[in-house]
Amino acid sequence: AGTGNVTVILNGKPSSMTNDQLVNLLKNMPVSNVAKAEVMYNAPAKYRVRGAVINLVLKNTKSEEPFVRGEVGTEYMQARYANGSGHANLSFVGKKLSADILYSADYQKRIIDNDIISHHKIGDIIYDIEQYNKGERRGLTHNMRAALDYQLSENDHLNMAYTSAITPNRKAVEKSSGNFSESSNSKMGDEQMHNVNVDYTSSLGLNVGLDYTYYNYPSTQDYINKTESSEQLFLADASQTINR
C-alpha cells in the first residue's frame, strides 16, 4: 500500500517552505553537510506532521581548532538544449561557532513538443484534426543559503538560517498550428522565495523557534488564438504571494 504524501523536514522540525522548495534546497546542498536521513512511515507526535516523513539531519560540527573548508562543483546535461548548474560552499567551524554559506545557479531550458492527430465522426462525416504544438521553457535560478550555529553553553544552542531561491525572467512560450486553430501563448515572470529560520534550545529543555517564508511570483500572459470563425486575444497580469 502507498504512503500518500511524504513530508520533508529539517533537523526534526517542520518548515514553512513547500516540499518542492525543500527538495530544491537539498539538491544544491553539498552531501558533506548532511549527517543522515531518517524515514518514518508514521511520524511521532513531536514532529507535528501527519503521515510519512523524511527527516534530514544536517551536520553540526564543532572543533577545538578552528578551520575553514570549501567546495565547488558543476554539472552539465545535454539534451535538445544544454542545461547546467554550479555550486560553491564555504564553511567555518570553531569551538562554539559554525557558519556556512552556499550559492548555486541552475539553468534549465526545455523543449515542448506535443502533436495531436484525431478523427471525429459526426453523423456520416469524419473530421480530421491535426495540431502541432511546440515551445520552450527556460529559467536561471539562483539559490542562496547562509546558516549559523552558536553554542552558548554545553546545552544551549542558537541556530539561524536564511534561504532564498530567485528566478528572474522565467519564460514559457508555446505555439500551436494546424487545421483547427493557430495559437500563441507566452508567460513571463520573476519568481522569488525567501525563508528565515531561527531556533533556540536551552539547557532547561525549552525550545523556541521562528520559521517564516515569503514567496512572490508576478507574471504576464499573452495569448492569441485564431480559428476560421473567431479570434481570441487577451493579456493577463497575475501575481501569487505567500506569507507564512
Pin down the residues of each PLM region.
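Extracytoplasmic beta-strand/coil segments of soluble accessory domains associated
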Residues: 1-18
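Short acidic/polar hinge/loop motifs at secondary-structure boundaries
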Residues: 15-43
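N-terminal periplasmic accessory domains that precede
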Residues: 22-24, 49-73, 84-86
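Outer-membrane beta-barrel translocator domains and adjoining extracellular loop/strand segments
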Residues: 51, 112-125, 171-179, 219-229
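Transmembrane beta-strands of outer-membrane beta-barrel pores
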Residues: 74-80, 94, 105-109, 164-168, ...
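Face-selective signature of the C-terminal outer-membrane beta-barrel domain
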Residues: 97, 141-169, 184-244
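Surface-exposed beta-strand-turn/loop segments characteristic
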Residues: 99-140
